[in-house]
């Protein structure tokens, strides 16, 4: 009741709710492809690699979206370059590049005069989101979802069978980097909601939950987006009522939903699989 009254009275809470739900939905969409491609570590890498861009934008007085997106794309390209031009495997290249970017970000933060805004970027503070940031998040979400819908068949084929995708004449490498671009945009849009540290959880956890419940990609995307939005709403509620960190609250809610599915999913749930074993 107190939360609903706050929504009626305070514009900052309205903006926080809209932004959180938007991030939850778009994270579920892009996270579904990340899960299917086994690229969870890449999501973590890009979320950390944007830190120097955020720090530079802050020190130069620019919108952090610009710096974060630039460094996120640079990290994705750097990982691909190291992987392709050396014997280094993909997971090793990811570890090297994202660690270097994150370390650079920490050094740049030490030169900043104030760490307050940067702290919010690290850990999220959606209750302080500005109207411009809210609209930027909405625009990014619309662009990402529209592009996913436009290239849905290409992403579908290349995610399940890259070899067959190449046989059909699809540019698998282009689709990979294109997906990395979309992942970077989603990561940047989620910074103020859950922060750099926790953004990978919102990308992965709702999608992983949906993965336990269905074998169909289109249904998985819808479920992941729904779980992301629900996690955002419930997490924001607890954040507002109990004065908790908004990003952490959302991630914990998403994790609880995951474990419910992990236990009770009709086909993949732990309890149901144990029950089938007993019957057999």
Curated annotation (Swiss-Prot):
Pfam families: ABC-3. The keyword ATP-binding does not apply. It comes from the Bacteria. Its main location: membrane. It is a multi-pass membrane protein. One of its GO terms (cellular component) is ATP-binding cassette (ABC) transporter complex. It is found in: Cell membrane. Keywords: Cell membrane, Ion transport, Membrane, Transmembrane, Transmembrane helix, Transport. One of its GO terms (biological process) is monoatomic ion transport. The chain crosses the membrane at residues 16-36, 41-61, 62-82, 92-112, 137-157, 168-188, 193-213, 221-241, 244-264. Belongs to the ABC-3 integral membrane protein family. This protein is probably a component of a manganese permease, a binding protein-dependent, ATP-driven transport system. This is Manganese transport system membrane protein MntC. The lineage of its organism: Bacteria, Bacillati, Bacillota, Bacilli, Bacillales. The gene is mntC.
